[in-house]
């Protein structure tokens, strides 16, 4: 058994600008809660989005759960836009085309939980 406190999870990838053609539209930071190999079943990260930054439309090969930890953001699929804030939990089924990110006037952060081995395929350029 392990206990994690959000404030104790190391920022493993400082806020960087992702190169053109990658999944994010701007600067993000990543904290790896479960480092690769520590769980045979799950991958868990905390993703921090700068103001207005989002990821592009994409799909996952497994279900995804997002737990909003800070700021204001959106989770969007092909037919719905959900405005989210701290404490909201979003379930995204395997194969659903979607994006998530910060509102235009707020940074945003969420925990992302997926099955180990999950593949992400970017749909939007």
Task: Enumerate the language-model features and the residues they cover.
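A short hydrophobic beta-strand segment most commonly corresponding to one strand
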Residues: 47, 91, 105-123
